[in-house]
């Protein structure tokens, strides 16, 4: 019985220590296909390597939140860091600017990464 209690305590302590770890997300913004003005495409924001899992991701068009956005399920890597993909259909043109805004406990203010049509 004492062995079980010790093992249970060690498991709880290791899980508690995992919550103390914080890693900022890596943010990548890209289109599914090469940008071609006037042709439908998909805008992707891949957020990876972050911990803890609480995160807020918004896709932006000219600084305003895009409402019709889908995302993958929250998943984790071998190192227990998390990753997500947010995406939406869009039609690129010369005048509109697209970006991904991420809020995470590791950032003092939300971080915004602009889409570079040449990437």
Curated annotation (Swiss-Prot):
Pfam families recorded: C1-set (PF07654)
Gene3D superfamilies (alphabetical): Immunoglobulins (2.60.40.10)
GO biological process: antigen processing and presentation of peptide antigen via MHC class I; immune response
Recorded GO CC terms: extracellular region; MHC class I protein complex
Ig-like C1-type domain residues: 25-114
Primary location: secreted
Disulfide bond entries: 45-100
Keyword Disulfide bond: yes
Cell compartment(s), UniProt: Secreted
Function: Component of the class I major histocompatibility complex (MHC). Involved in the presentation of peptide antigens to the immune system.
Assembly information from the UniProt record: Heterodimer of an alpha chain and a beta chain. Beta-2-microglobulin is the beta-chain of major histocompatibility complex class I molecules.
PANTHER family according to UniProt: BETA-2-MICROGLOBULIN, MHC CLASS II-RELATED
Similarity section: Belongs to the beta-2-microglobulin family.
Protein name per UniProt: Beta-2-microglobulin
């Amino acid at each position: 019985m004492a062995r079980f209690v010790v093992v249970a305590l060690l498991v709880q302590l290791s899980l508690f220590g995992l919550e103390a770890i914080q890693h900022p997300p890596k943010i990548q913004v890209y289109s599914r296909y090469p940008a071609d003005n006037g042709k439908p495409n998909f805008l992707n924001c891949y957020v990876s390597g972050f911990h803890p899992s609480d995160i807020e991701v918004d896709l932006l068009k000219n600084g305003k939140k895009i409402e019709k956005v889908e995302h993958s399920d929250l998943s984790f890597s071998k190192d227990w860091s998390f990753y997500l993909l947010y995406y939406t259909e869009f039609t690129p043109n010369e005048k509109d600017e697209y970006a991904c805004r991420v809020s995470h406990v590791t950032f003092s203010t939300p971080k915004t990464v602009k889409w570079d049509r040449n990437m």
